[in-house]
Amino acid sequence: MTVPAFTVVIPARLASTRLPDKPLADIGGRPMVVRVAERAHASSAQRTVVATDAPAVAQACAAHGIEAVLTRADHPSGTDRLAEVAAQLGLADDAIVVNVQGDEPLIEPALIDEVALHLAHHADCAIATAAHPLHDSAEVFNPNVVKVVCDAAGRALYFSRAPIPWARDAWSGVPAMPAASARVPLPDMPVLRHIGLYAYRAGFLRRFPTLAAAPLEQTEALEQLRAMWHGERIAVMQTAAAPAPGVDTQADLDRVRTLWAQSMAQEGP
């Protein structure tokens, strides 16, 4: 597998409502954003850059030899922030930029490579992303779990917080929002959970801030729907299993710290 040249950009903002100062949270003696950058460095990326509007994050990165750029604080979405970084770095239109979320300290470097390669193999698409099959009906009906349906070529048809596709026969009589404890049969067709990892062409990132916000984007609160609303194609790479957990809450952080310690113990001195 020949992985194309690509740059990783890691957005990192301090203004998290559920976990204040999240990028600076300690994981094994280093800030979380540094741990994410270390995972990106272990991929085939030619360059890894943290994008932040917080001098404290930039300083933490500098202290650990991680490149960081300061961006405006008023970006309406993470993709708008990436667009500013692509411009700052002077990337060519055909350059590939992989957006690794700043709260994914356990992300597999191979997954980063794979999404970059997937975009390189789909010249008709401006974006590539990933998804995996769901096996738990509670996740299927959870609006915090984003689902995606694809066409025969593996391009996204739609992303939604709703359970899609709706299994008319299997879910006959099932309420739209069943109790989390309810046992709901899964349809024969896999329900795909979207993984929030993206590869973009830099030329698209430059165009993105000029695109008008889309009604579907605003209704679902999913910024990738703006790209689709304006006719851009998104290639979806399917993985067999879910990625390692990210960090949204204190409970997530505690879990990731435990997993990190376990992985270090397995590696040994």
Swiss-Prot record:
The lineage of its organism: Bacteria, Pseudomonadati, Pseudomonadota, Betaproteobacteria, Burkholderiales. Activates KDO (a required 8-carbon sugar) for incorporation into bacterial lipopolysaccharide in Gram-negative bacteria. GO terms for cellular component: cytosol. HAMAP family: KdsB. It is an enzyme of class 2 (transferase). The keyword Ribosomal protein does not apply. Pathway: Nucleotide-sugar biosynthesis; CMP-3-deoxy-D-manno-octulosonate biosynthesis; CMP-3-deoxy-D-manno-octulosonate from 3-deoxy-D-manno-octulosonate and CTP: step 1/1; Bacterial outer membrane biogenesis; lipopolysaccharide biosynthesis. It catalyses: 3-deoxy-alpha-D-manno-oct-2-ulosonate + CTP = CMP-3-deoxy-beta-D-manno-octulosonate + diphosphate. Belongs to the KdsB family. One of its GO terms (biological process) is CMP-keto-3-deoxy-D-manno-octulosonic acid biosynthetic process. GO terms for molecular function: 3-deoxy-manno-octulosonate cytidylyltransferase activity. Its EC number is 2.7.7.38. NCBIfam families: kdsB, PRK05450.1-5, PRK13368.1. Transmembrane segments: none annotated. It comes from the Bacteria. Keywords: Cytoplasm, Lipopolysaccharide biosynthesis, Nucleotidyltransferase, Transferase. It comes from Cupriavidus taiwanensis (strain DSM 17343 / BCRC 17206 / CCUG 44338 / CIP 107171 / LMG 19424 / R1) (Ralstonia taiwanensis (strain LMG 19424)). SUPFAM superfamilies: Nucleotide-diphospho-sugar transferases. Pfam families: CTP_transf_3. PANTHER family: 3-DEOXY-MANNO-OCTULOSONATE CYTIDYLYLTRANSFERASE (PTHR42866), 3-DEOXY-MANNO-OCTULOSONATE CYTIDYLYLTRANSFERASE, MITOCHONDRIAL (PTHR42866:SF2). InterPro entries: Cytidylyl_trans, KdsB, Nucleotide-diphossugar_trans. The gene is kdsB. It is found in: Cytoplasm. Gene3D superfamilies: Spore Coat Polysaccharide Biosynthesis Protein SpsA, Chain A. This is 3-deoxy-manno-octulosonate cytidylyltransferase.
